[in-house]
Each structure stands twice: as C-alpha cells, then as structure tokens.
C-alpha cells in the first residue's frame, strides 16, 4: 500500500505527462493540489463529476487521442492507491474508464 506522498508524486507525474503528450494542463486541478493537497483535490474533482453526472472535460480529448491512461480516474484505480478512495469513488472511476461494447 502506498501513502499520500506517493499518490501526490504520481499525480504530479501524470499532470506533467499530460502536458507533454496531449498539451492538456489540468490547470484547475493543479490549483486545488497546491491549495488542498493531491488527495483532497482529486476527491473534490470526483465529487463534482459524480454530483453532476458529467464526464470530466478532458475525457473527450484523451479518448479521441487514445490516451485514456492520462485520466486522473485511472490513477484512482491504480492498485497502489485504490485504498485511499471510497467504494463509490472507485466504482465511478471504473465505470468512466471501462470501454463500452459497441
């Protein structure tokens, strides 16, 4: 099991990779990470998405570019960090990133 510091490092690496690969900056999330910490920022992001039932605004960008691996929701599902999240948060992320049959 990894701790919050490791999660923070992984999130910052994902944000950096996203910026380099897809030119997506995760700017609002970065601001929240600075203000509240990585775990709280991601939980806040998930709460907003779950309450509005809207896809994250970056979803289409990453899906169209075949880079779903750059979604924060995939980091939530990482076995090293899944214990940091509620069952509801994990289920939401799993539903979001699981490919649907045509």
Model-derived features with residue positions:
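Amphipathic alpha-helical packing elements
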Residues: 15-64
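Charged, low-complexity surface segments at secondary-structure and domain boundaries
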Residues: 1, 13-17, 28-29, 43-44, ...
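Short amphipathic alpha-helical segments that mediate assembly, nucleic-acid/protein binding
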Residues: 4-8, 26, 38-39, 68, ...
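A general marker of short, structured functional hotspots
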Residues: 3, 20-22, 32, 77, ...
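Amphipathic alpha-helical binding modules
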Residues: 61-102
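Accessory DNA-engaging acidic/polar modules
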Residues: 10-13, 24, 50-57, 70, ...
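Charged, compositionally biased N-terminal leader segments and the immediate start
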Residues: 1-21, 95-99
